[in-house]
Amino acid sequence: MEKEEKLEKTNFDVFEDLKRRVRFTRKARIQASKRLRERHEFFEKVSYFYSLLVLIFSVWFLNMGNDKENLVATKILLIFSLSLTFFTMFLNIKNYKERASSFELNYQNLDILLNKIERRECDPESITDEEIKGLHREYEKLLLEKENHLDIDYYVSNKKTREKYASKINQYVWRDRVVKCLVAIYPIIIIFAIVLYTWLNSLLAIHL
């Protein structure tokens, strides 16, 4: 009798642990989907911005005048065109939008599994080993069929983990902001570098 009670308790504990893991994984993958979709939207806007700059400068640099100005204009347009090509390739390689959709489908399936577990929780005494193994297999299948989420997705998934990993979250947020800022001001940096280089060359040519 004691052995049976111990077995039932163990099964229920395993069942509760599985429910907790499914819930945490679902929340983390919701955050992963949001992160990837936001990343896609940001880089897509950057690509549009670069396309607009290429168009503006292409019109602006028409008939600049002397050969030196035309050379500078050509360099700027070439760099912007290559940057636009790079970002287009980068977006295609990273595939942020499709990966975000994949995570959305995955967490929806995890939600279905979680509902199944919660419905089964109404009668915990009748939970069997085979039933728990079947639920575990469903959970493992959902984990393996998609890429894994990042640690940051787990850190921001609920209030408790946000408080526990606050320093790591802040580090990630600041690093992400710096990267986005550098990407956004990249055209300004390039223009400044080309103008500075051209000015220094002209200055040296005068004094030599």
Language-model features: where?
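Conserved non-transmembrane functional hotspots
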Residues: 2-46, 92, 97-183
